[in-house]
Each structure stands twice: as C-alpha cells, then as structure tokens.
A protein has these predicted regions:
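S-adenosyl-L-methionine-dependent methyltransferase catalytic core, i.e., the SAM/SAH-binding region
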Residues: 1-275
C-alpha cells in the first residue's frame, strides 16, 4: 500500500498491522520531521516499510525508482498535522504566536506567502483570495494589504491577521462566530504557496495507472476546493468505467470523533475501487 501523506504515521500504523511480513508499505511526505516521527512510530510493523521524502504529485516517479509498478491501495490525507501548524518557521497558523509569513511545507519551493502578499498587484491578490479562499470580501482585503505594504513590508502572520481584521472591521482580538476572519486568506495563500490543487490534480491523474484491478484510492479532503476535485475525478472515472465508487456521498466524522479532534469536523473521505 501507499500512504501518500504519511505524516506521523497514524494511518500507516493502522493499515500496516494488517499487511504482514510479505507486505510493503510506502510512505511519502515532503516534511522531514514528519518522516522521522513516522519512522519511529512504524518501527514495530512486521511489513517492509519504505519512507520517501517526496510530494505525492511525484508518486509515479518514486514508485518507479523502487521498482514498484502496481499497488493495492493509495491513501491521501490532505490535512496538516498539529506539529506543522505550530511550527514557527512554517507560519501556517494565525492562532499561535506571531510567525514569519512563509507557509512553505517544502522548503525547496522558492515563493513564500510574504512574496505573494508583497509582490502581487491588487487585482491578482483579490483574485487569489477569492478563488482559493472563497472569500467574498477578497477585493477589500487586497486593498488593505496593498495600502499597508506601501508603509512597510508585510513579513509576519500577525501583521497579516491585523490587516485582514481591519479590512473586515473586526477587532484583532475577537473572532467572528465559528471562523476567524483570516481563515480564508491564510487558506488561499497556503494553497498557492504549496501548489496544493496542482499537486492533487497530478495525484488523481496518476492513481488509475498505479492501482491494480480491485485496488482502492481513498482521499481525505478538508475544504470544498479539494473535495470538489476529488468528487469530479471519481465521477468522471466511474463514467468511463475506470472506477467503481464505494462512497456515493463522502464519509464524515461523527460527533464523538469531532469532540476528540476538532479539525475532523471538516474532513470528508471518498473511496473508489479500480475496475
């Protein structure tokens, strides 16, 4: 099996226990600290464990390098772990201490969130926040960003939170019901910096070529842009006779799981089987 986003190894540990000594588990992650945590966590498994530093967009290339042509199961959990959200160097969160406005999971990428915020023109910023953040106030937010950067370079998450809150006339220390005002802007920047949708599209396009007949593709998404892509891809492949859908509607977390893990409230699981 392939865990395309191995993270700290939680999913891999669960599935790896059922593989046995003859099984092979390949785990990919672009974040080195996550790979080290996974290596420690999966050490007790009896199956062969291969961990690779790579984005799942390059899954076909990585499997080719390992001499693996077909697999029985591909799992992709598109969420972030708590350690990444708390990592000051990544600057992914607006809820923790003031962080550098970076947002790169893969440090080999050259463009940071600060580069976008300080470099894009107002229209491009507004379009990005609207398309990737789905924020109807995108033009107003972009206007406030441009106004602030004319005074000083925007380099920290705290600065950006303050700007967005000002644009939405929300005091920096208060949240609107259920969702922080900066949520959508941060989502848009994170998606753009890490090329998340482009990478997901590449994985979805590659999966049918890698799965054996009867093999499974399972994707856990966390916002509508991801889920919409997965839903469309699964439906198209079903119509073309490539997949059989095992989830007509996405599987979502029950109240007990949400109580234990608040981020699970946004998770949607879709599963397809290769014909």
């Amino acid at each position: 099996m392939v865990d395309a986003t191995v993270g700290h190894g939680g999913h891999s540990l669960l599935f790896g226990r059922s593989l046995g000594p003859e099984g092979i588990l390949v785990g990919l992650d672009i974040d080195p600290p996550s790979l080290e945590r996974a290596r420690e966590r999966l050490a007790s498994l009896t199956c062969r464990v291969i961990l690779v530093k790579s984005n799942f967009a390059c899954l076909a290339e990585r499997l080719g390098e390992l001499g693996i042509e077909k697999v029985d199961f591909i799992l992709a959990d598109l969420g972030f772990n708590s350690a990444q959200l708390a990592d000051a160097e990544m600057g992914l969160s607006f809820r923790t201490e003031d962080m550098p406005l970076d947002m790169r999971i893969d440090k080999s990428l050259t463009t940071t969130a600060a580069d976008i915020v300080n470099g894009y023109d107002e229209k491009s910023l507004a379009d990005l926040i609207f398309e990737y953040g789905q924020d109807r106030a995108s033009r107003r937010i972009a206007r406030y960003i441009v106004r602030r950067r004319q005074q000083e370079r925007i380099t920290t998450t705290g600065q950006l939170v303050e700007i967005v809150c000002s644009a939405l006339r929300t005091p920096g220390g208060k949240h609107r019901p259920r969702k922080h005002p900066a949520t959508r802007t941060f989502q848009a920047l994170r998606i753009a910096v890490n090329r998340e949708l482009e990478n997901l599209d590449r994985l979805l396009a590659t999966a049918p070529k890698l799965l054996r007949t009867g093999g499974y593709l399972a994707v856990i998404s966390f916002h509508s842009l991801e889920d919409g892509r997965v839903k469309w891809d699964f439906k198209r492949n079903q119509q073309e006779g490539v997949y059989r859908l095992l989830t007509r509607k996405p599987i979502v977390a029950d109240p007990k799981e949400i109580a234990e893990n608040r981020r699970a409230r946004s998770a949607k699981l879709r599963i397809a089987q290769r014909n």
